Amino acid sequence: MGSYGLLESTLKEILEAIKPLREDRLTRDRVIADLRQVVQSLENFRGATVEPFGSFVSNLFTRWGDLDISIELPNGSHISSSAKRRKRSLLDLLFRVLRQRGGWNRLQFISRATVPILKFVSSPHGISCDVSIDNLEGQMKSKFLLWINEIDGRFREMVLLVKEWAKAHDINDPKNGTLNSYSLSLLVIFHFQTCQPAILPPLRYLYPGNLVDDLRGVRAVAERHIAEVCTTNIARFKSDRSRLPNRSSLSELFVSFIAKFCDINLKAYELGICPFTGQWEYLSSNTRWLLKNKALFIVDPFEQESNPARTVSLNNLTKISEAFVTTHRKLVSGNQTRNSLLGTLARPHILPFNTNGPVNYSRYNGLPNLTHRAGNSPQMQHHYRAGSSGSSQVQHHYQAGNSPQTQTHHEYLPVSSSQMQGQYGYPRRPTPQGQHQFQNSRQSPSFQLQMQSQHPGQGQRKWTPRP
């Protein structure tokens, strides 16, 4: 079996072990119901709703994934925007109530975080939970990632694999200065935008505005507007027959993903990763980015001045880069075995995992032995159907052994933008005035497909997003 064939089968084996089953979703539904019962019993939370978000809503969670929950406070039909002081007060109340009633372990109230969070583990189910107040932004971002699943089903598979790989290399832990899962999902989006041919467009073509800023007024109206714009543009993008299909296998996409970020520690000094524009952006092009710059800047496509990777420290950025380099070296080596690949791509407990056996959640959160039985139920099917299949196999532009410096990428760019310079779609240098690069180019509804010599005569195509 060739190196890519062995890698492909190993990745599929890992996916079978980490993909949630129907019972895993039902377990999280029960945790939400238990918390809802507690919240509704408290006078201070009268009229509040308990709503999940994060990977559970976007269908990007694994069998051991944490559960993000937002308690939405009543504000008539309008979007609630409680002050941070009130959020802290209510979470502190909930903290004391849960501790008193029992059934909730490892309670921790993080009051000084940007978003105050109450963390705990549901004792009956062994599920780790993060609870916040009025986190509608998180809910809408989660729904957007779910909608992206409609474009190409390989997106979900890549996110699950990348998250497991990152955990295996201890770089998926924001509390200790590495990447959070949302940042890892954005890296996968960015890779799908810059691979050749591109699988995803710049996200500004799916929603051209700042999504978080548009969450105001009547909640139902705001949510419906965002959903209509996104789903319309996604459908239009998928139906564009002039778009070159990308039929790369999962293994080819994974290897090129690892190669793309091997020198992320070097690029991060002056470049930010921007899924909104689908390209690397010079940090000097936006003074607000410079003011908020950390060791690594990943532009939140739904809140463009925010950096989801702000917790990454300089030392850990080197660690993250080394994980990419080490993994790339092993993936392109000629002496791969199943066991060596598993040791590189997954945590030790994944290796012998029986996908139809009991899921011991406490094994991963430090609780006493709490075993949850996941029977031989069919694999969970989400209420949104994933898009085009990612299992087809064709040749890929990336060849084993190529260094990141020699790899080229296929990018979608606005018509008014000039050709990108350098490797990995390096952007043009900013103007001396340091103008925001989003504003420098005309916001033409069309975008240009940059072609390479192996695709002669393809020329330019247009695709118009809904404003």
Where are these regions (language model features)?
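Conserved catalytic core of two-metal-ion nucleotidyltransferases
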Residues: 42, 87-139, 157, 168, ...
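Intrinsically disordered, low-complexity regulatory regions enriched in Ser/Pro/Gly/Thr
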Residues: 33, 41-46, 60-65, 87, ...
